[in-house]
Amino acid sequence: MSAQLINGKEVSQKRLQAVAEAVAQRQQDNLHMPCLAVVLVGGDPASAVYVRNKKTACQKCGIKSLSYELPESTSQEELLALVDRLNADSEVDGILVQLPLPKHLDSQAVLERISPDKDVDGFHPYNVGRLAVKMPLMRPCTPKGVMTLLEAYGIDPKGKKAVVVGASNIVGRPQALELLLARATVTVCHSATENLADEVAGADILVVGVGIPNFVKGEWIKPGAVVIDVGINRLDDGSLCGDVEFETAKERAAMITPVPGGVGPMTIATLMENTLHAASLHDA
């Protein structure tokens, strides 16, 4: 029997609508309009698409967006100076620096320069640390989006065995913290993990984010598992696929996210929620 598809597009539209309603209510209450500043360095085509999608989401929600498109040659000092200006600008609630940055720039130093209360991506060590001690402030967008999807489909991680494949700072590590916060029993797999197939086979909830097409084989999936595929990879023929071998996995899983249309839309919806949350922090 084929798995039920987890429709991220549908869930994200509901979340965006809720943000739009909250923004409209803020206007009625004479509170300031939330504002997101997006910084793009260089001309990476995929990054340009992501930035465009974020601007579109802002328009849907009534969130003001400011765009800063900097040349590839931008220096570390110039980028940090822009972040400092945005930190000091009381009109700006959220700051997003689109990753990856050109190789000559230090991404970590840039992310750490963003004020934690404006870190709507949730990448600042302060925000990851707060998540680790069960006091989240700004939650990383993709992991929080995954948790929103699970909630929307009535999947409670409490007491379940959750396996996260991939240990990146953007997805894997904060995803493990989110699942731990939801009281799952969490295993994190990475490049040094032995017997990956055995680890995957024990998962009630499987979250994969490694950036390698079809990395997790369908036959590894535990029958009845919930599979969340965070990967999005473009193949030589131009088609998109995830990190999980979809066609075989959907014959074993109970529920699975498609690629595209699964986790991706949730990341942007969560970004809008975080920007709204940041605005509320700045009301006082």
UniProtKB/Swiss-Prot annotation:
Record organism: Neisseria meningitidis serogroup C (strain 053442)
Which residues hold NADP(+)? 166-168, 191, 232
Role: Catalyzes the oxidation of 5,10-methylenetetrahydrofolate to 5,10-methenyltetrahydrofolate and then the hydrolysis of 5,10-methenyltetrahydrofolate to 10-formyltetrahydrofolate.
HAMAP family annotated for this entry? THF_DHG_CYH
Q: Which GO terms describe its molecular function?
A: methenyltetrahydrofolate cyclohydrolase activity; methylenetetrahydrofolate dehydrogenase (NADP+) activity
Return the Pfam families for the record.
THF_DHG_CYH, THF_DHG_CYH_C
Official protein name in the record: Bifunctional protein FolD
Gene Ontology biological process terms, A to Z = L-histidine biosynthetic process; methionine biosynthetic process; purine nucleotide biosynthetic process; tetrahydrofolate interconversion
Which keywords describe this protein according to UniProt? Amino-acid biosynthesis, Histidine biosynthesis, Hydrolase, Methionine biosynthesis, Multifunctional enzyme, NADP, One-carbon metabolism, Oxidoreductase, Purine biosynthesis
Q: In which pathway does it act?
A: One-carbon metabolism; tetrahydrofolate interconversion
According to UniProt, the reaction catalysed is: (6R)-5,10-methylene-5,6,7,8-tetrahydrofolate + NADP(+) = (6R)-5,10-methenyltetrahydrofolate + NADPH; (6R)-5,10-methenyltetrahydrofolate + H2O = (6R)-10-formyltetrahydrofolate + H(+)
Gene Ontology annotations for the cellular component aspect, listed alphabetically: cytosol
The UniProt entry's sequence similarity note says:
Belongs to the tetrahydrofolate dehydrogenase/cyclohydrolase family.
Instruction: List residues traversing the bilayer.
Output: none
- Summarize subunit and interaction data from the UniProt record for this chain: Homodimer.
Which InterPro entries does its entry note? Aminoacid_DH-like_N_sf, NAD(P)-bd_dom_sf, THF_DH/CycHdrlase, THF_DH/CycHdrlase_cat_dom, THF_DH/CycHdrlase_CS, THF_DH/CycHdrlase_NAD-bd_dom
What Enzyme Commission number does this protein have? 1.5.1.5, 3.5.4.9
